[in-house]
Amino acid sequence: PASVAAACGIDAFIHAEEAYISTAASPFSDAMAEKAMSLIGRNIRRFVANRGDIEAAESMLVGSLFAGIAFSFARLGNVHAMSHPVSAFFDVPHGVANAVLLPVIAEYNALADHGRYLTIYNDISPVPAYAEEFEPMMLVDAIRELCGEIGIPENLTEAINNASKTGPVSAEEIENKIEAMTVDA
């Protein structure tokens, strides 16, 4: 289904993105991450729209492999660290939790960007940007746009309620579980 393709595809992209901005990144992990982000970023929309598109599927597959190699050498970051408890406490699919958290964490990390956000932006945005005009918040907006185009919920509350098997989850319930997550961390 398209929803599974979107969740798995964005998860693979985030594997590469987190490896690329990791403090443990190296020239080798960067090469793997850059190729992964390019392959996935340029094909995820096509693949989610048509899982029978063999060319897009192959690019997603190879991109996912390169992303796995990249994060094996450079590690993951805050997106994955925060998404695992969200998935465990709320039954939100892993890739969806990652995708919902990515723009928030990218915005938080924007002040620490040393030019890598531009590369990531150009891999996912249909409109290229150049260094002279680029601002890190452009990446945050492009992530939100991509996620919206492939059917990812806009925020954590929406993702939690979409995943709920017992009906709507109140803001208070979400807040209480998040508080419990921070205590357990």
Show which residues each predicted segment covers:
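Gly/Pro-rich interdomain helix-loop hinge
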Residues: 86-176
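Alpha-helix N-cap/helix-start motif at coil-to-helix transitions, marked by capping-box chemistry
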Residues: 4-11, 27-38, 76, 96, ...
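Charged/polar positions within long, soluble alpha-helices
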Residues: 45, 69-72, 76, 107, ...
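Glycine-rich phosphate/pyrophosphate-binding beta-alpha loops
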Residues: 65-98
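Amphipathic alpha-helical interaction segments
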Residues: 31-35, 39, 59-62, 81-84, ...
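Glycine-rich flexible loops
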Residues: 14, 20, 25, 61, ...
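Carboxylate- and glycine-rich phosphate/diphosphate-binding segment that chelates Mg2+/Mn2+
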Residues: 1-74, 165-166
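Short alpha-helical scaffolding segments that buttress acidic/His motifs in well-ordered protein cores
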Residues: 13-17, 60-68, 82, 102, ...
